[in-house]
């Protein structure tokens, strides 16, 4: 029983560590260009002041709005090939470095994010 529990916990730790590593890699290869120094008003990496109001909006809302494109940031960070999951991990990596305590979205949260994205996209089409 104890060994089985230990294996399950070990697997969870490995997956959460991998998600963090993936978020960091995506940040460094895509997001860092703007977020490292706050280019065009982008919230600066590790800036609690910049990120606090964003974090208050909630993980689901922020991921959907940002993935859709917000302020001067283009949709998907300007990378049409960037998957929602990879984008989410990078955003969570940045938010957590700036005071959030967010985890990778659950399946239910991804459903909410995708529903919000569908609404945002339908608004774009009618404008």
Label the model's feature ranges.
Residues 70:
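Short, surface-exposed glycine/acidic/tryptophan-bearing loops
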Residues 16-18:
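N-terminal signal peptide c-region/cleavage motif recognized by signal peptidases
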Residues 33-64, 74-77:
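Gly/Gly-Pro-rich "capping" loops immediately C-terminal to redox-active cysteine motifs
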Residues 77-127:
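Flexible coil segments in periplasmic/lumen-exposed cytochrome c-class electron-transfer proteins
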Residues 27-37, 90, 94:
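The canonical Cys-X-X-Cys-His
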Residues 25, 60, 64, 88-92:
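Solvent-exposed, polar/charged alpha-helical surfaces in well-ordered, non-transmembrane soluble domains
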Residues 2-14:
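Sec-dependent signal peptide recognition
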Residues 20-24:
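Boundary of Sec targeting at the N-terminus
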